[in-house]
A protein has these predicted regions:
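C-terminal lobe and pocket-closing loops
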Residues: 344-355, 368-378, 384-475
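Helix-loop-helix "hinge/cap" segment bordering the ligand-binding cleft or interdomain interface
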Residues: 129, 133-137, 187, 191, ...
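Hinge/lid segment of periplasmic solute-binding proteins
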Residues: 83-99, 169-221, 244-247, 255, ...
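A structural signal for short loop-to-beta-strand junctions that line the ligand-binding cleft
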Residues: 155, 163-166, 193-229, 260-261, ...
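Extracytoplasmic "Venus flytrap"/periplasmic binding protein-like
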Residues: 126, 130-197, 204, 231-234, ...
Length: 508
């Protein structure tokens, strides 16, 4: 998982199939790792591993902790971890703030990304400076991703041992929205910032009109283009406005270079989820029942399949752009474009250093003027307050400041490279165009120009908040997308298989 709230890393590392069905060996060299050239009997092993993981995730959901999300619902925060660059930390770590004074409230905070501890501590220090009569001392515990979410589930169920404040990854959040919700509604704390915060990001962590999580960033899905590679192939990225334009440019690039233009994702759904939202679709019906084989889903996946057939998309190593196997392909210029959440900026700086000054950020392609939305947010980590905390009201006020205030969101951009959820920052050119900022220096366009282009059209898939999503993500990223883009299965047939499997799992 890429929890760089970023993000949930949408990677399903169980399946290593990166061979594009029907591709020549010459083309495969761009997206096959050496260890994958002899698949042989590995296919069966992969299917067994995928099945075991699916079963394990189901058990996890029954235990009340939710499954690991994979696709575009994941977190990107500290790195968002990877995504932000957030790769979830594997071990526990504990630290305490050193706060002077007699009237100081201690808040226990759980995280699964160490970078979040740094950010929260720095912002709590600013809070204490501005609010000397309401000082807080954060005691932060960082745990492995699954360990922390499982521990939280048990603590809320037993009524003992829960923290005051906790980070909950987007893919896990729905599991904490069922039954007696143990988290505090945050509406009052959010209210002072509501006018400037991207509403769709608050909705990710909401139920029945109540907000239960403070978002870390927007994760606006944008397009990243290697302008040097495209110009050499005679392509002007600024002419790419629609998916038809994207397809035409991709086919031209493939013909000119023999290299992939963009990723046909098999271990994530960044592009699919964007298209689905633009078409006004979803994975579920309005009543919450499964509908992964609906007509809109078929249309979107067929659009991607047609792009693959035209040479505009290819299956790449790692199955998606945000993967350690894929970074070298982008860094070397072997793949020219990526449709990804904005937090991918941090990946470029960390893993694609050779592209400094060669990458443009643009609004993503659309189908047309009648699209339901222009883009969506991808990934996320919601910071929640435990309802039973004796300091719940103060904790909510403090963390609303830490996550939503102008001051905090300037640092979200400067330090983490994420697109701030508080859009007041988006128009502050002293921040967004600061020549000393490492992200401003890296990209050859102004990063926030793309965000401003889509500011009035940032939507979401409502299914993100449903407890079925971890299972849906899992089957798409281990079976369905591979069946379509690697095995050449008919789109409707592959989706019907997924629908049947999920209906069996949930008894529908």
């Amino acid at each position: 998982e890429n929890r760089g709230d970023g993000s949930l890393d949408q990677t399903a590392d169980l399946t290593e199939k990166h061979v594009s069905h029907g591709r020549s060996s010459e083309n495969r060299r761009y997206f096959r790792s050496d260890k994958e050239k002899h698949l042989g009997g590995k296919c069966m092993k992969k299917k067994v591993l995928a099945a075991l993981m699916c079963a394990a995730m189901t058990v996890g959901m029954l235990a009340g902790c939710g499954g690991n999300s994979t696709a575009g619902n994941s977190s990107s925060d500290a790195g968002e971890a990877a995504s932000g660059t957030e790769s979830a930390d594997s071990g526990a770590g504990r630290r305490e703030m050193d706060v002077e004074g007699d009237d100081v409230t201690t808040l226990e905070v759980w995280t699964f990304i160490e970078n979040h501890q740094d950010f929260y501590t720095n912002m709590a220090e600013k809070w204490n400076e501005e609010n000397p009569d309401k000082k807080v001392k954060l005691v932060l515990s960082n745990m492995a991703y699954d360990d922390m979410h499982n521990k939280l589930s048990l603590a809320l169920e037993s009524g003992e041992g829960a923290p005051d404040v906790v980070d909950i990854e987007l893919g896990k959040f729905p599991a904490f929205m069922t039954g007696d919700i143990g988290l505090k509604p945050l509406n009052d704390a959010v209210e002072p910032y509501l006018d400037n915060v991207v509403e769709s990001r608050l909705q990710l962590y909401s139920k029945d009109g109540n907000y239960y999580g403070f978002p870390t960033h927007v994760g606006t899905t944008v397009a990243f283009y290697n302008t040097e590679a495209l110009e050499a192939a005679g392509i002007d990225y600024t002419t790419i406005k629609t998916w038809d334009d994207f397809k035409e440019a991709g086919a031209k690039y493939k013909e000119a270079t023999g290299k992939p233009f963009a990723a046909c994702e098999t271990t994530a759904q960044w592009t699919l989820n964007l298209m689905l939202a633009q078409k006004g679709g979803d994975y579920l019906n309005d009543d919450g029942s499964l509908a992964v084989n609906n007509d809109t889903m078929v249309e979107c996946l067929q659009t991607m399949k047609d792009m693959q057939d035209a040479g505009a998309m290819d299956v790449i190593a790692g199955g998606q752009p945000d993967n350690e196997e894929a970074y070298p392909l982008y860094n070397s210029g072997d793949v020219a474009a990526a449709i990804m959440p904005f937090w991918q900026t941090s990946r470029y700086l960390s893993y694609m250093t050779d592209l400094s000054g060669k990458v443009a950020i643009a609004a993503p392609p659309v189908f047309g003027d009648n699209d339901a939305v222009k883009t969506i947010g991808g990934g996320g980590t919601g910071t929640a307050v435990v309802a039973s905390s004796p300091n719940a009201d103060l904790a909510a006020e403090v963390f609303a400041y830490i996550k939503l205030s102008d001051t905090a969101n300037v640092e979200v951009w400067n330090v983490l490279g994420f697109d701030p959820v508080n859009t007041a920052v988006w128009t502050d050119k002293s921040v967004t165009e600061n020549p000393d900022n490492q992200y401003v220096q890296y990209f050859n366009t102004k990063p926030f120009d793309a965000l401003l282009d889509v500011q009035d059209g940032i939507g979401l898939l409502t299914c993100y908040t449903d407890e079925k999503m971890p299972s849906i993500n899992n089957i798409f990223c281990t079976e369905t997308l591979n069946n379509i883009f690697e095995s050449g299965m008919d789109v409707k047939e592959a989706l019907d298989e997924a629908q049947s499997a999920l209906q069996n799992e949930f008894g529908e």
